C-alpha cells in the first residue's frame, strides 16, 4: 500500500483530523491520526497489517507485543498474519508493565507493533520491558510515523506511512497563541497537562 493510498484511506474514513490537538506525548499539533477509525474496518485492518507482517515475516518472530491501547488491534492482526503469539503492555500507576499473565522468555524474539509514533515514548517503554525479561527485539513496526523517521527505536524499523507532522511544545504552540480550542482525542491522558 503506497503512502498516498494510505492517506486516502485515512481521509475517506474520517481518520485524518485537522484542528488543534493535545497528543499523548503532551505536544500539540494541527494534525491527528485517529487510527481506530481506519482499523474498525476489517478490510483496511487486514491490508495495512499484511504490509507490516510481510516486512517482518523472515525475522523468525516468536511474539508480537504492543503498547495498550492504540497498538493492540494492529499488533493482534500482525501476529495473526505471522502466526505467532500476541501480547500487550499496559499502564499501571503510570508505567508500562506486563499484566494478565503475559510473560516473555529469555531469548524470545519479539516484534513491537504500534499504531502511531510521535516521540516513541510508549514503544521505548515496551522495548525496556522486553529487555528486562531477556527478550530480543527483532524490530518495530508502525502504521504511521509522525516523525518522518527521526525517531529510531530499533535497527529494523518499518512504518507504512512516514511523514513529518509538526508538533509543538505547549508554550510554543502557535495554535494556542491564536486561541484555537484544544482537543485531546488520545487513548490516555497526556503526560504534560
From Swiss-Prot:
UniProt-recorded Gene Ontology molecular function terms: magnesium ion binding; orotate phosphoribosyltransferase activity
Catalytic activity entry: orotidine 5'-phosphate + diphosphate = orotate + 5-phospho-alpha-D-ribose 1-diphosphate
EC assignment: 2.4.2.10
GO BP terms, alphabetized: 'de novo' UMP biosynthetic process; pyrimidine nucleobase biosynthetic process
PANTHER family: OROTATE PHOSPHORIBOSYLTRANSFERASE, URIDINE 5'-MONOPHOSPHATE SYNTHASE
Family membership noted in the UniProt record: Belongs to the purine/pyrimidine phosphoribosyltransferase family. PyrE subfamily.
Oligomer status and interactors: Homodimer.
Protein name: Orotate phosphoribosyltransferase
Organism of origin: Prosthecochloris aestuarii (strain DSM 271 / SK 413)
Organism classification: Bacteria, Pseudomonadati, Chlorobiota, Chlorobiia, Chlorobiales
Gene this chain is encoded by: pyrE
